[in-house]
Design a protein with these regions (language model features):
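C-terminal ends of transmembrane helices
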Residues: 1-5, 46-59, 109-119
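Membrane-interface helix-loop-helix junctions at boundaries between adjacent transmembrane segments
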Residues: 1-33
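Cytoplasmic-side transmembrane-helix entry/capping segments in multi-pass membrane proteins
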Residues: 4-16, 59-71, 123-127
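Juxtamembrane "helix-exit" motif on the non-cytosolic side of transmembrane helices
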Residues: 24-29, 51-55, 79-87, 114-116, ...
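Structural signature of hydrophobic alpha-helical transmembrane segments
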Residues: 28-43, 90-104
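Hydrophobic alpha-helical membrane segments
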Residues: 69-76, 95-111
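Interfacial loop-to-transmembrane junctions
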Residues: 111-133
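Juxtamembrane boundary at the C-terminal end of a transmembrane helix
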Residues: 139-152
Length: 152
């Protein structure tokens, strides 16, 4: 991924970075207080957004990057108090917040790309939003079924 410099690959780099850094950040979340985790989420959100907006040659990427950083920080703060993770291996857990951040990033990039190319939002956002809702519904149903012991 890294040697590539086209817009598509820069956006993929940002998405992969967001996913893996949030995963590693939440893997060590129990060692720090929530304020440090929120600051870390803000920094990664800001840097990832800055990377994407640089790929689109946005005139003023700072404000939009700060907004995205705050959204990721808010997601991190809420997730810190309600951490859920999936067992990948006995020693490796995948935090749900990583999946949610990646999905929100996917929808956000599609939104910005549609605005950048002056395309209709409904056409460009329908599939990503439905995919995000479907994945979030599956995750929520799974967590609720585990919580209420409906499945084994």
């Amino acid at each position: 991924l890294k040697p590539r410099s086209s817009r598509k690959y820069m956006v993929i780099q940002a998405g992969v970075s967001l996913f893996f850094v949030i995963t590693s950040l939440f893997s060590a979340a129990h060692l720090v207080v929530s304020s440090w985790l929120v600051i870390g989420c803000f920094v990664i959100g800001y840097l990832v957004a800055r990377h994407v907006f640089t790929a689109y040659e946005e005139d003023d990427p700072t404000f939009l990057s700060i907004v995205w950083g705050f959204l990721i920080a808010e997601l991190g703060w809420a997730s810190y108090h309600w951490v859920m993770a999936y067992d990948i291996t006995p020693t490796l857990l995948l935090p749900m917040v990583s999946i949610i951040a990646a999905l929100f990033g996917f929808v956000g990039v599609r939104f910005f790309d549609a605005k950048f190319h002056d395309e209709p939002l409904r056409k460009r956002l329908q599939a990503p939003v439905l995919f995000t809702i479907a994945v979030l519904a599956v995750l929520l149903i799974r967590e609720l079924s585990v919580l209420f012991n409906y499945t084994s």
